[in-house]
């Protein structure tokens, strides 16, 4: 009997929170995996150290100006160094069985599509991929016999609750939200909230940008759109509930009145491990819930005045086309301006809505055929329009 073939894996966004948790799981069983590609951003030391430890074929930094540093850090390791958007796509096109897509933002779309085109299972932690180009991504997966598995904790929870179920029997999907750093702040205080304050998540250990998106609930707005794309459910049947403990990740309601809930400690290794080992379940190094110690779980409806991003997500789902790409790009650029201290916390939603309104005034842009090029062009234009709106404010 021959030896079992190693499973070829790639991790895009390897130096971020999701990527590091994925590496943690893979490193516990290194003899089972052949690491093809790792990608990261500016943290060259971490990227190089992980590439050496996992003996990756190639390590890619998103920043071309850091290629020299990456090559120096990998000297003598036998790991190839590459940099820039084209290198990310080339790495995604390298044959792999399983690919983690954890690059933050729209930059994850092109390498994700490349992975699908070579038939890989794409573990999707990059929610922007479906928000910006859901129809394109799903059609690419279908055409090439590839598979998409959710890694967001909410969508993984829904996916697990639906095992063996008929989507026709699903009445509603409920995704939970912690409410973020400001969930209990008085509304009048939000205008003075800083990026540093927004980056303090009460439950999850995540990067700065996604933690701020949690505070504004732009993160949840993206997840609502992703739920529609991933599960093909009518937007009117997707609900959001604020759940401060972050122990219930999602619920699925059925037409017989049953409500199936998925519970687990707030540890992303749950969802990552499920996607990594699917369709099996294997032991994971995560805390087990002690319900008696937990005592109680709390839920409340989100406040529309506090979280206008949810209303904008509903508009995007109703509008369709390339509006998701506009929404995401405008959100990302508005977040840049908030982090830089140029706008207030409450200004982000207004800026995003203004850009959506401007695109709606020229519907030919939103209704253009969805291709990688049109998504990319729309993304760039939306960012430019955010900057133009900022310049107008300053003038």
Curated annotation (Swiss-Prot):
Binding site for Mn(2+): 152, 154, 223
Assigned EC number: 1.1.1.267
Keywords: Isoprene biosynthesis, Manganese, Metal-binding, NADP, Oxidoreductase
Pathway where this protein functions: Isoprenoid biosynthesis; isopentenyl diphosphate biosynthesis via DXP pathway; isopentenyl diphosphate from 1-deoxy-D-xylulose 5-phosphate: step 1/6
Group of enzyme by EC: oxidoreductase
GO BP terms, alphabetized: isopentenyl diphosphate biosynthetic process, methylerythritol 4-phosphate pathway involved in terpenoid biosynthetic process
Tagged with keyword Cell membrane: no
Catalytic activity as recorded in UniProt: 2-C-methyl-D-erythritol 4-phosphate + NADP(+) = 1-deoxy-D-xylulose 5-phosphate + NADPH + H(+)
Binding of NADPH, residues: 15-18, 41, 43, 126, 128, 207
Matching Gene3D superfamilies: 1.10.1740.10, NAD(P)-binding Rossmann-like Domain
GO MF assignments: 1-deoxy-D-xylulose-5-phosphate reductoisomerase activity; manganese ion binding; NADPH binding
Lineage top rank: taxon: Bacteria
Cofactor(s) this protein cannot do without: Mg(2+); Mn(2+)
Keyword Oxidoreductase annotated: yes
Membrane-spanning residues: none
A Pfam family matched in the record: DXPR_C
Binding site for 1-deoxy-D-xylulose 5-phosphate: 127, 153-154, 178, 201, 214, 219-220, 223
General function of this protein: Catalyzes the NADPH-dependent rearrangement and reduction of 1-deoxy-D-xylulose-5-phosphate (DXP) to 2-C-methyl-D-erythritol 4-phosphate (MEP).
HAMAP family noted in UniProt: DXP_reductoisom
Family as reported in the entry's similarity comment: Belongs to the DXR family.
Protein name in the entry: 1-deoxy-D-xylulose 5-phosphate reductoisomerase
Highest classification ranks of the organism: Bacteria, Pseudomonadati, Pseudomonadota, Alphaproteobacteria, Rhodobacterales
């Amino acid at each position: 009997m021959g030896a079992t073939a190693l499973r070829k894996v790639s991790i895009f966004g390897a130096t971020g929170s999701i990527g590091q948790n994925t590496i943690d799981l893979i490193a516990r069983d290194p003899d089972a995996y052949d690491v093809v590609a790792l990608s990261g951003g500016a943290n060259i030391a971490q990227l190089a150290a992980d590439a050496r430890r996992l003996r990756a074929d190639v390590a890619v930094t998103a920043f071309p100006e850091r290629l020299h540093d990456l090559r120096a850090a990998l000297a003598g390791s036998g790991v190839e160094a590459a940099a820039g958007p084209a290198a990310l796509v080339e790495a995604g096109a390298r044959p792999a069985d399983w690919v983690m897509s954890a690059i933050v933002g729209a930059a994850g779309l092109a390498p994700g599509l490349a992975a699908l085109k070579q038939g890989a299972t794409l573990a999707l932690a990059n929610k922007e991929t479906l928000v910006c180009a859901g129809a394109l991504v799903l059609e690419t997966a279908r055409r090439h016999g590839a598979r998409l598995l959710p890694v967001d904790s909410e969508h993984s929870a829904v996916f697990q609750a639906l095992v063996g179920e008929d989507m026709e029997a699903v009445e509603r999907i409920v995704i939970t939200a912690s409410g973020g750093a400001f969930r209990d702040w008085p509304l009048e205080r939000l205008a003075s909230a800083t990026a540093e304050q927004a980056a303090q998540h009460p439950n999850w250990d995540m990067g700065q940008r996604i933690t701020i998106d949690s505070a504004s609930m732009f993160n949840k707005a993206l997840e609502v759109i992703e739920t529609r794309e991933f599960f093909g459910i009518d937007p009117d049947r997707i609900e959001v509930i604020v759940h401060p403990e972050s122990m219930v990740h999602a619920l699925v309601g059925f037409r017989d009145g049953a409500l199936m809930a998925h519970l687990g400690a707030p540890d992303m290794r749950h969802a990552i491990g499920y996607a990594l080992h699917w369709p099996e379940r294997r032991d994971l190094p995560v805390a087990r819930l002690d319900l008696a110690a937990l005592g109680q779980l709390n839920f409340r409806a989100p406040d529309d005045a506090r979280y206008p991003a949810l209303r904008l997500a509903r508009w995007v789902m109703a509008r369709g086309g390339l509006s998701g790409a506009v929404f995401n790009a405008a959100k990302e650029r508005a977040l840049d301006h908030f982090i830089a201290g140029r706008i207030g916390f409450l200004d982000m939603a207004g800026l995003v809505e203004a850009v959506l309104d401007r695109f709606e005034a020229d519907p030919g842009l939103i209704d253009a055929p969805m291709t990688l090029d049109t998504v990319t062009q729309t993304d760039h234009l939306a960012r430019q329009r955010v900057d133009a709106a900022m310049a107008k404010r300053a003038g």
